[in-house]
Design a protein with these regions (language model features):
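Class I SAM-dependent methyltransferase SAM/SAH-binding core
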Residues: 61-122
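A short glycine-rich, Lys/Arg-flanked "PGG" loop and its adjoining helix->strand segment in the class I
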Residues: 148-160
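Conserved class I S-adenosyl-L-methionine
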Residues: 165-188
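Short alpha-helix
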Residues: 199-214
């Protein structure tokens, strides 16, 4: 396989993505979305198999893979049957890729030259390279007009007969989509994720048509997931920009600094809860019910719609 720009030899402290919101987010997907282990089991079932009928390992790309959580789950599942695929992780954030190594999310023996620094909309990979491409909750991170580029690029780098599996938001109505988008944009604004505020666009069920326009066939959404968004679970994320800057400056965080960051995260979460409660006063009861929206004295909880989509390149 050709050489790509990987995390080896890159000084993440000086990389351009330190100024973007995505690179500074230090929250785990599982924490902020209240996922169950069964959700990932279903996801893995749709990604499988990990080799062909002759036992040759598949080449799988974890696109927009961040710190490698999906890859770690795939490898753990595949090792149960001694059926380990060749994994690559692609992400434009050097920080996120390096976090996969330093946090222990990825196995110690994971090849560093398989951590590829690239924008998923225009990758360095050759045509027809991967047996499977996976993207978990990544498509919504780019503007609406750019999302089609992701699907077209995935189609290009997939082998004939290859499979694309994505776990993504898929709102059944535009009202719920707008509510979720407005609340998450406010969260990003409070946290200082300036790039995410302007870039994010959360899909509706129309994403199925986008798959087909890109060339995918037999597009299906075999599973609907019901994760829980608990705003209080966002406290650490809301102070992660400051936490990252302190780590970059000093290499460590003191007890006093950590206490201040915890306090800052709580204060910002208080602000987000107040905003959300006020925002939801104008939302109809049927939409609230569809979102399973509920409030407590200091928290807001709701359940966005997410689905697993599968499409094939024939």
């Amino acid at each position: 396989m050709d050489k790509f720009k990987t995390i080896e030899g890159i000084n993440s402290m000086n990389s351009v993505d330190d100024q973007t919101g995505q690179a500074n987010r230090l929250a785990t997907f599982e924490d902020v979305h209240g996922l169950k282990s069964s959700d990932f089991e279903v996801f893995l079932q749709n990604i499988a198999p990990f080799s062909n009928s002759e036992g040759k390992p598949y080449v799988i790309l974890d696109g927009m893979g961040g710190y490698g959580d999906v890859t770690a789950h795939i490898l753990a599942e595949a090792k149960k049957s001694n059926n380990v695929p060749e994994m690559y992780i692609a992400d434009e954030s050097v920080n996120q890729l390096q976090r996969g190594v330093t946090s222990g999310t990825l196995p110690e023996d994971f090849a560093k030259d398989h951590l590829v620094v690239t924008d998923i909309r225009e990758t360095p990979f050759s045509n027809n390279l991967f047996d499977t491409v996976v993207i978990k909750m990544g498509i919504h991170e780019v503007p609406l007009q750019e999302q089609a580029k992701i699907l077209k690029e995935v189609f290009r780098i997939l082998k004939q007969g290859g499979k694309f599996v994505t776990w993504e938001l898929a709102f059944s109505n535009k009202e719920s989509q707008k509510i979720f988008q407005d609340i998450l944009r406010k969260k990003d604004e409070i946290a200082g994720f300036t790039q995410l505020v302007s870039n994010r666009w959360f899909p509706t069920e129309e994403i199925r048509q986008s798959f087909e326009k890109a060339g995918f066939v037999d597009v299906d959404s075999p599973h609907t997931l019901e994760p829980t968004v608990n705003l209080r679970k966002r406290e650490s994320e809301l102070s992660s920009v400051e936490r990252t800057k302190l780590m970059q400056k000093n290499g460590a965080i003191t007890v006093e600094e950590n206490d201040s960051l915890i306090k800052l995260g709580k204060q910002r979460c208080d602000e987000l809860v107040v905003f959300t409660k006020q925002y939801m006063t104008s939302v109809t009861s049927d939409i609230k019910q569809a979102m399973n929206y509920r409030e407590t004295e200091d928290n807001v909880i709701f359940e966005p719609e997410k689905k697993i989509f599968v499409g094939y390149k024939r």
